[in-house]
């Protein structure tokens, strides 16, 4: 909810109520990093006594976490990523350990109320490089990562991994199937597979997101003029 969020505070996932300015009790302790989608959390716990990072998931209000995998300490925490999403009624868990990528699918994540649910390995690939970041796209349809100028993208509809070179690591999502970048003040748009490049706008400021409104009629972005920066709107059709 907009007034309640999850934060990692001193290695503890805690719920924060922004309206009442309350930080609730710890939900999960000893966490190094986490991601969230809906009411589910996926996280990597700090090194345990066995020198392992533990990847787990947790459904809010459940009795406890469910362990998914263990990772040896030889793999640094900055090379481990976990992400969740839901697409067309199917739920997905993505793990990246070094260059090893896995995508699991399920009708419902395992939890203590229904331990019969299971994760199905839908995709397993070796990445061409260790990513510096890996995340769920804004529309929940892709898992995306970057390593220098290399972009890695998991298309959940086709359940395939795409890897391609871009001229920088600032390419990002514009809408469901489009990605964009700003090069020399021009907004360049690409299909999700990096094909069909075209320039759609000029005098665009770099370093800012751009969004298309809900009915796909207007594009909002940060432009430049003689006075500096300005929020602009362009009609798409």
Place the predicted regions along the sequence by residue.
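Repeated scaffold domains used in trafficking and secretory/extracellular systems
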Residues: 1, 27-40, 74-86, 122-138, ...
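N-terminal "mature head" segments of proteins
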Residues: 1-2, 13
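Structural hallmark of WD40 beta-propellers
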Residues: 3-4, 90-92, 141-142, 177-178
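Secretory/export targeting leaders with adjacent low-complexity proregions
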Residues: 6-9, 18, 33-45, 90
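Residue position within the beta-strands of beta-propeller blades
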Residues: 7, 42-44, 93-95, 144-145, ...
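Surface-exposed loop/turn elements that mediate protein-protein interactions on large endomembrane-trafficking
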Residues: 8-27, 50-75, 98-128, 146-165, ...
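Charge-rich, low-complexity intrinsically disordered segments
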Residues: 88-102
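Blade-level signature of beta-propeller repeat domains, shared across WD40, Kelch, NHL, RCC1
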Residues: 207-237
């Amino acid at each position: 909810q907009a007034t309640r969020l999850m934060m990692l505070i001193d290695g503890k996932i805690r719920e924060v109520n922004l309206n009442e300015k309350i930080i609730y009790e710890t939900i999960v302790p000893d966490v190094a990093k986490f991601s969230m989608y809906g009411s589910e959390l996926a996280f990597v716990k700090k090194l345990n006594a066995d020198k392992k990072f533990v990847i787990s998931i947790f459904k809010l209000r459940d009795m406890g976490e469910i362990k998914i995998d263990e990772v040896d300490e030889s793999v640094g925490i900055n090379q481990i990523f976990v992400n969740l999403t839901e697409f067309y009624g199917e739920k997905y868990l993505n793990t990246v350990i070094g260059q090893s990528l896995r995508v699991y699918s399920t009708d419902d994540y395992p939890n203590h109320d229904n331990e019969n649910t299971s994760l199905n390995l839908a995709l397993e690939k070796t990445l061409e490089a260790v990513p510096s970041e890996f995340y769920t796209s804004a529309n929940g349809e892709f898992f995306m990562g970057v390593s220098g100028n290399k972009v890695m993208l998991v298309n959940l509809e086709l359940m395939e991994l795409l890897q391609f070179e871009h001229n920088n690591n600032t390419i990002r999502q514009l809408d469901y199937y489009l990605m964009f970048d700003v090069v020399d003040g021009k907004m360049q748009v690409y299909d999700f597979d990096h094909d069909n490049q075209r320039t759609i706008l000029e005098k665009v400021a770099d370093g800012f997101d751009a969004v298309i409104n809900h009915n796909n009629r207007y594009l909002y972005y940060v432009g430049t003029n003689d006075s500096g920066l300005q929020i602009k709107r362009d009609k798409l059709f």
